[in-house]
Design a protein with these regions (language model features):
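Serine-dependent carboxylesterase/thioesterase catalytic core
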Residues: 1-84, 100
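C-terminal catalytic-base region of ester-bond hydrolases, centering on the histidine
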Residues: 86-183
Length: 183
């Protein structure tokens, strides 16, 4: 697309797709405008992953159909994290109730002027269909190139988002997050 239009691309990746997006951005930074990851294991230490054993086995299982070198993508993305940071905006969306990718593996440290971690509600499988996630992705993609700003929602939606993430931070997440508190 970049070669056809001359415009930079925004890469959005969900789960392992975020690992591929991050890797692509490192390989061709001149073609990439921004990267958005959704519950992606971008900070995994393959030797001591906090992922459950079943999830580790799943990564190994799905790596084979992707090709002989697919298993190396996750460690490479993790190593890339320690090198020079991406020269473009990076928004990492993660959930404390993901169930597949632990929050510490779906977030990144980097340049606070270009990189951010955004907590969202929901499960790993639901991230691609979650209205809050889609709203945030649309917000990130709507920013003009060269004028990136951190996600700081305002208005009624911003208030609702802050209330929701405050509940998550307070530990009121998981299966009961849609039920009223009963005391």
């Amino acid at each position: 697309m970049h070669h056809k239009t001359g415009r930079k691309l925004s890469l959005v990746g969900w789960s392992l797709g975020g690992v591929f997006a991050l890797y692509g951005a490192h390989q061709l930074p001149e073609c990439v405008r921004s990267v958005i990851t959704l519950g992606s294991p971008i900070s995994v230490d393959p030797e001591g992953s906090a992922s459950p054993p079943l999830v580790k086995a799943m990564y190994r299982l799905i790596a084979h159909p992707m090709g002989p070198h697919a298993h190396s993508m996750q460690p490479r993305a993790s190593k890339l994290r320690g090198r020079a940071t991406l020269p473009m905006p990076l928004s990492c969306l993660y959930s404390i109730s993901d169930g597949i990718v632990p929050p510490q593996e779906a977030t990144v440290e980097g340049d606070p002027d270009l990189h951010e971690n955004i907590r969202v509600p929901g499960s790993h499988i639901g991230l691609g269909f979650n209205a809050v996630v889609l709203w945030i992705v649309a917000d990130r993609l709507s920013q003009p190139e060269g004028h990136w700003r951190r996600f700081e929602p305002s208005g009624p939606l911003g208030h609702a988002y802050r209330m929701l993430t405050h509940r998550l931070q307070a530990g009121q997440h998981g299966r009961n997050n849609c039920r009223p508190n009963r005391r």
